[in-house]
């Protein structure tokens, strides 16, 4: 087989979510080495290491011939690589190999949830171009959320049960599971303003959150637009069939309790200040400015058969 790439770098973290990370590395390198003449395996020991390595790759201090990046890990590890690539303007394709609890964006890329199968898919995967979310000075592939979604993430981090489980964030009758915190918000989306009281606001780039698909048929991470959802009712027992697919044109007509607003530039303030979940990482508080950066990143994508 002809090598597609000259020098690939595989990033991984010891706490990737795999039970045996060293075994996992061995399982994925068989396929990856078949498409790269040279494959470097790079451990990320501390948070921020991957961003530092991206800077070294940009300045050619890491190596002069790197032409593809791979990441084995969960959404948090992937998020760090996205931030490294975006902040250092690395115009390199990325292959994502699932290795954590949730890999929401790999579903969008049609990548198998098993890391070994995913590595084999990289052999024939094609490069696709995707939008990225910019939040203040950080970047994300998939979503930005606050309110109930943060409460859930903190539950999971504390080792408590994930109340959403495999249910959609937009489908759970969460009032019976958790007492959501109400907060006041002021939201500007493409110069239109919205305000009120809510328990959750979610801005999505990708169609999968928490392992399930948002039932909005035209939501795409390749359309140069973000989709913001405001949960207006305290109890989200909102639909005859929450999983019934709908598009942007009729969402607000048939979906009670969740307002959908598409847009490109978003400013959000809250009272009180609220923690913000960015692709599963809680690292900011409101106020925040959000914008879409179209066609910003190259990701290996498996053709949907």
Curated annotation (Swiss-Prot):
UniProt keyword annotations, A-Z: ATP-binding, Kinase, Lipid biosynthesis, Lipid metabolism, Magnesium, Metal-binding, Nucleotide-binding, Phospholipid biosynthesis, Phospholipid metabolism, Transferase
Active site per the UniProt annotation: 281 (proton acceptor)
Gene Ontology biological-process entries: phospholipid biosynthetic process
Cofactor note: Binds 1 Mg(2+) ion per subunit. This ion appears to have a structural role and is required for catalytic activity.
InterPro entries, sorted: ATP-NAD_kinase_N, Diacylglycerol/lipid_kinase, Diacylglycerol_kinase_cat_dom, Lipid_Phosphate_FormReg, NAD/diacylglycerol_kinase_sf, YegS/DAGK_C
Molecular function terms, GO-annotated: ATP binding; ATP-dependent diacylglycerol kinase activity; metal ion binding
Main function: May catalyze the ATP-dependent phosphorylation of lipids other than diacylglycerol (DAG).
PANTHER family on file: LIPID KINASE YEGS, SPHINGOSINE KINASE
Record protein name field: Putative lipid kinase SaurJH9_0749
The organism of origin for this protein: Staphylococcus aureus (strain JH9)
Organism lineage string: Bacteria, Bacillati, Bacillota, Bacilli, Bacillales
